[in-house]
Amino acid sequence: MTYLFENYKRAPIEFVKAEGSYLIDSEGKAYLDFSSGIGVTNLGFQPQVQQALIQQAGRIWHSPNLYLSSLQEQVAQELAGSYDYLAFFCNSGAEANEAAIKLARKATGKQGIITFQQSFHGRTFGAMAATGQDKIKEGFGDGVPHFSYAVYND
């Protein structure tokens, strides 16, 4: 019996520890981490990242975009480099995709967006609409309209 909603079919493995790019299961077996926490820990499990997180947690965990953040500004500047770019920070890939959908539609005035068959963009309504897999969308009714799906290498 589980009290967890099964939004994914879970593999019968429990990871209890991580070292570098490896995950260690409850039996002590090491696995090369190809999932990266599905985006949330894509820097691996490095001691320097752990120390930076501990140091930041001692200061402040979160400050919304309603307020200034010198660290956020510094990272945005590093990302932009010498280009005239702006950064938009998100909590997840689905949120980034939702923002990209909105930005593309607002900037162009067009509604249509093309993604690829067999793609995966997230589980929010806009991200599911962008996803080129019917099985991801089944049971949720009409999604966000105006998506087309191209075939890879066609």
Region locations from a protein language model:
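Active-site-adjacent loop/helix segments that line or gate small-molecule/cofactor pockets in enzymes
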Residues: 1-19, 59
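Glycine-rich loop-to-alpha-helix module at the N-terminal edge of alpha/beta enzyme cores
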Residues: 2-3, 30-110, 114
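A generic local structural motif
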Residues: 8-10, 76, 99-101, 133-136
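Active-site and channel-lining beta-strand-loop segments
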Residues: 13-33
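Solvent-exposed alpha-helices and their adjacent loops that cap or buttress functional pockets
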Residues: 14-16, 80-82, 106-107, 138-143
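Residues at the C-termini of beta-strands that transition into short coil/loop
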Residues: 19, 91, 117, 151-153
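Short beta-strand-to-turn element immediately C-terminal to the catalytic PLP-Schiff-base lysine
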Residues: 24-25, 43-44, 130
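PLP-dependent aminotransferase-class I/II
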Residues: 119-154
